[in-house]
Amino acid sequence: MMATGTADSQARFGQSVKGLLTEKVTTCGTDVIALTKQVLKGSRSSELLGQAARNMVLQEDAILHSEDSLRKMAIITTHLQYQQEAIQKNVEQSSDLQDQLNHLLK
């Protein structure tokens, strides 16, 4: 009877160890999955940060180009103002010459 009791005890112990081992393997698998998800999330964050940095460089280039264009437009505006003033003076002189010509022809 003693041998049977020992065999039963060993069988129960074996089942208990199997149960604990299965539980530990399941927990370990769950932890590996969680770790993998975290690594992937970190990898994605790094990818997003890289993309954000590239976008900022593109925006900075666009801003610098816009500033350059605005400076050029300011120069063109100044030149157009000078030309407009010159044209206005010529129109006034033309009007004066027209008056003088009319006066001479009378």
UniProtKB/Swiss-Prot annotation:
Subunit structure: Component of the BLOC-one-related complex (BORC) which is composed of BLOC1S1, BLOC1S2, BORCS5, BORCS6, BORCS7, BORCS8, KXD1 and SNAPIN.
Compartment list: Lysosome membrane
Family, per entry: Belongs to the BORCS7 family.
Domain of life: Eukaryota
Keywords in alphabetical order: Lysosome, Membrane
Cited function: As part of the BORC complex may play a role in lysosomes movement and localization at the cell periphery. Associated with the cytosolic face of lysosomes, the BORC complex may recruit ARL8B and couple lysosomes to microtubule plus-end-directed kinesin motor.
Main location (coarse class): membrane
GO CC field: BORC complex; lysosomal membrane
Name assigned to this protein: BLOC-1-related complex subunit 7
PANTHER family, alphabetized: BLOC-1-RELATED COMPLEX SUBUNIT 7, BLOC-1-RELATED COMPLEX SUBUNIT 7 BORSC7
